[in-house]
C-alpha cells in the first residue's frame, strides 16, 4: 500500500485528491496539510511514501517545505509538486530542493494515481518537456554551481553518455534509439548512474549533470 499525504491550502483540492486516490486499491491517503510548515510537521509524524505538494501556500511555501523534508534523515517521502502555473519560474529550484517531479492539478484521476505509483516506485515524474524548461532556467541562472565532480569518474563511458542524453531532455525511448540499445538497457544504465553518484532519481541526476558542467545549455 502506497501511503500518500496531500499538502495544499485549498480544502477542495485536498478533498478531491483524497477521493480520487481513495478509490485506488493500492493507495491510501494518510493525512493532509494546509501549509508548508504543517506539511513538514505531518510528514515527520505520518511518514508517507509520497507527498503531493502545492507551491504557493501560506506560512511556508511548498519549495521551502520540500527543501526541509528532503534534508531530513527521518523522512523518506518522495515529493510531487502540484501546480496550475507555468513551470518556468520555479522548475529548477523545485528540483534542486528535492522534488521528484511535477503534476498538474487538473490531471485526471488515472494520471494522478499513476503519478503516485511512478514516484513511489523510485522513478522521477519528469517529462522531456519539463527537462527542456529546466535547461532554459539553468542557462538563465548562469551556469555551473561547481559541486564536486569526483564521482563522475566512477561512471563508465556508456553511463556518462546516457546521463548526458537524459540531461538534454531525451526520454528513455529516445536515448535507446540514439544508442541503438533496448529501453530496458537504458533504464539499467540510469539506475547504475544514480547508484554511483548517490542520487535519488532522474531529476537529481539532471540537476547534477548541469551543476558539474558535464552538460551545458546549448551543447
Label each region the model flagged.
Residues 8, 54, 83:
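Active-site residues of response regulator receiver
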Residues 26-34, 42, 199:
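Short hydrophobic/Thr-rich beta-strand motif most characteristic of the beta2 strand and flanking loop
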Residues 35-38, 60-67:
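Acidic catalytic/metal-coordinating carboxylates
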Residues 169-204:
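Recognition helix of helix-turn-helix DNA-binding domains
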Amino acid at each position: 500500500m502506497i501511503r500518500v499525504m496531500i499538502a495544499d491550502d485549498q480544502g477542495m483540492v485536498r478533498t478531491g485528491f483524497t477521493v480520487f486516490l481513495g478509490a485506488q486499491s493500492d493507495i491510501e491517503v494518510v493525512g493532509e496539510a494546509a501549509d508548508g510548515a504543517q506539511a513538514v510537521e505531518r510528514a515527520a509524524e505520518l511518514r508517507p511514501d509520497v507527498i503531493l505538494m502545492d507551491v504557493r501556500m501560506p506560512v511556508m511555501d511548498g519549495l521551502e517545505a520540500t527543501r526541509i523534508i528532503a534534508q531530513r534523515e527521518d523522512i523518506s517521502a518522495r515529493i510531487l509538486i502540484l501546480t496550475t502555473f507555468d513551470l518556468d519560474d520555479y522548475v529548477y529550484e523545485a528540483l534542486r530542493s528535492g522534488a521528484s517531479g511535477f503534476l498538474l492539478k487538473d490531471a485526471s484521476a488515472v494520471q494522478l494515481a499513476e503519478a503516485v505509483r511512478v514516484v513511489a516506485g523510485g522513478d522521477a515524474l519528469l517529462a522531456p518537456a519539463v527537462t527542456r524548461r529546466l535547461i532554459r532556467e539553468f542557462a538563465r541562472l548562469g551556469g555551473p554551481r561547481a559541486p564536486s565532480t569526483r564521482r563522475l569518474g566512477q561512471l563508465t563511458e556508456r553511463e556518462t553518455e546516457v546521463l548526458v542524453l537524459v540531461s538534454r531532455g531525451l526520454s528513455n525511448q529516445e536515448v535507446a534509439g540514439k544508442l541503438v540499445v533496448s529501453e530496458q538497457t537504458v533504464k539499467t544504465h540510469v539506475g547504475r548512474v544514480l547508484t554511483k553518484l548517490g542520487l535519488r532519481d532522474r531529476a537529481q541526476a539532471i540537476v547534477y549533470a548541469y551543476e558539474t558542467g558535464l552538460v551545458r545549455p546549448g551543447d
